[in-house]
Amino acid sequence: VTAGVYVRVQGRFPFQIGPNRAGTALGIVRLGGHREGGETGWQCAAREAYEEASLQVSPVPPPTTYWYETAAADTPALFEGAWLEEGVAPILIGRHLNRHNMTPIYLAVSQDKPVPSHETKGLLLLSPEEISTILSKEITLGQYLDAGGKALLRADLPLNGRLEPFPHLRLLHWVLTQHPEILS
């Protein structure tokens, strides 16, 4: 079972960047990972934000919670639904088809400066406009940086590497379109 978090840091959202499994592009992946022990979803997301980007995070209550099927994450049908667990409510909950597993994704803020950890190749610090650009056309890491994009890179990533948005970046874009108040 996994959990993730969209962290707002000075109007930007840190996402991990690194080679995809096939080595054909640079995947853009949300902060998050597998739960450990008896962690809640929020505890996992907060720990992963710290482990991957050195961010101490504070939860932001979402305007609502959306559910979707993870198998359709590129073009999911999202619907509002209640979060019945105690504690912090997520903005998104991905349900895995034919399994009881869920992946909650939370909203958070941080005053810290993101720093990629030893397990993170790099971080892109994405503005809402940059997210829209990455989703609307093919762009390389070099083009992103030349256009003023912000990145913190630990590894030597190829500047000609095509940026590949993973589903959670598309989902964040949709959420920001529906709820621009999240940015304030």
Residue ranges and their predicted role:
Residues 1-31, 42, 56-61:
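N-terminal strand-loop-strand
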Residues 23-27, 87-184:
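Nudix hydrolase/Nudix homology domain
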Residues 3, 33, 37, 94:
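Conserved aromatic-histidine-acidic binding/catalytic patches
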Residues 11-13, 22-24, 36-37, 65-68, ...:
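Short, charged/polar surface micro-motifs in flexible loops or helix N-caps
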Residues 84:
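Conserved short secondary-structure elements within globular domains
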Residues 15, 54-55, 115-118:
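Short acidic, gly/pro-rich beta-turn/loop elements at beta-sheet edges
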Residues 30-81:
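The catalytic Nudix box helix
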